[in-house]
């Protein structure tokens, strides 16, 4: 059966020797199906592989019909942000531990990928956030986030103080260790550990989750996808804004962090038997079996 995916990019966790054997095996498998295989530059360098074209991420974005990512959720987050502007579908393969984004097992990857290449898969669209930092009314930093944009105290031990506005309307003055602005994808990450709600990934919603607030009545709130969230730094010694915990920018008093929904989306492909609720049970350790199994 012919596949709608003809050019496949393989991307692995960088500087991880454990990716070499499975990625080489996967590349040979894809080539045996008469598909064109691309490696991103850093993956090719880690594999010491010259049998396949090694290209920059921008070229993967312009040429690939599908990107297969081998690693953990952190690797997937990084690649998803880079490829989001190109709308390249992503498949995530974990290295033994099930991830929220990397749900294919490395043990059965060829069989599962074979089904996906033949059109048996579930497509899922995930929203992204875009945030900018303004200092003296000049934008000094910006970036995408698939999980969350988080303002936190830095290496110092003091709480930070900031004002929160939504769509130019004042919400509150918050004294806490920080604030997490999370997507549904990020609702099962840092935001969950801070007491935030779990949002189904099919929803376009944003959760605002305080981190250790000084006033216990400061609770998480959920807002619509078109909400423009502004965080205005007040008295703060050391604070940072983090994008998916990968990149960060140091904040100063009177800096403004502006968070909005990005026009870009991430497309994930899952096996046809994928179940979000089963994944929640397995990842979060929910116990118990149904009393009346169907």
Curated annotation (Swiss-Prot):
Enzyme Commission number(s) from the entry: 2.7.1.23
Q: What is the protein's given name?
A: NAD kinase
Binding residues for NAD(+)? 73-74, 147-148, 175, 177, 188-193
The cofactor required is:
a divalent metal cation
Q: Which sites are catalytic?
A: 73
Q: State the protein's purpose.
A: Involved in the regulation of the intracellular balance of NAD and NADP, and is a key enzyme in the biosynthesis of NADP. Catalyzes specifically the phosphorylation on 2'-hydroxyl of the adenosine moiety of NAD to yield NADP.
Q: Does the keyword Transferase apply?
A: yes
- GO molecular function annotations of the record: ATP binding; metal ion binding; NAD binding; NAD+ kinase activity
Q: Which reaction does it catalyse?
A: NAD(+) + ATP = ADP + NADP(+) + H(+)
């Amino acid at each position: 059966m012919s596949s709608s995916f003809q050019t496949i990019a393989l991307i692995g966790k960088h500087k991880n020797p454990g990716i070499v054997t499975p990625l080489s095996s996967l590349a040979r498998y894809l080539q045996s199906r008469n598909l064109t295989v691309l490696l991103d530059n850093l993956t090719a360098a880690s594999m010491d592989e010259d049998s396949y074209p090694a290209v920059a991420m921008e070229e993967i974005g312009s040429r690939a019909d599908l990107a297969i990512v081998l690693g953990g959720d952190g690797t997937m987050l990084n690649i998803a942000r880079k490829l989001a502007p190109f709308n390249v579908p992503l498949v995530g393969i974990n290295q033994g531990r099930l991830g929220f984004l990397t749900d294919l097992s490395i043990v059965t990857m060829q069989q599962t990928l074979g089904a996906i290449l033949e059109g048996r898969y579930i497509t899922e669209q995930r929203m992204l956030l875009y945030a900018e930092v303004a200092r003296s009314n000049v934008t000094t930093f910006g970036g995408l986030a698939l999980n969350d944009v988080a303002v936190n105290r830095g290496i110092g031990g003091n709480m930070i103080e900031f004002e929160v506005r939504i769509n130019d309307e004042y919400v509150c003055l918050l004294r806490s260790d920080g604030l997490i602005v999370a997507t549904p994808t990020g609702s099962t990450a840092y935001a969950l550990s801070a007491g935030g709600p779990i949002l189904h990934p099919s929803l376009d919603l944003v959760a605002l989750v305080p981190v250790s607030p000084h006033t216990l009545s400061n609770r998480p709130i959920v807002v619509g996808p078109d909400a423009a969230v502004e965080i205005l730094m007040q008295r703060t010694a050391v604070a940072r804004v983090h994008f998916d915990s990968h990149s960060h920018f140091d904040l100063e008093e009177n800096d403004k962090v502006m968070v909005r929904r990005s026009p870009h989306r991430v497309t994930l492909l899952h096996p046809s038997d994928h179940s979000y609720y089963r994944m929640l049970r397995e990842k979060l350790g929910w116990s118990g079996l149904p009393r009346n199994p169907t």
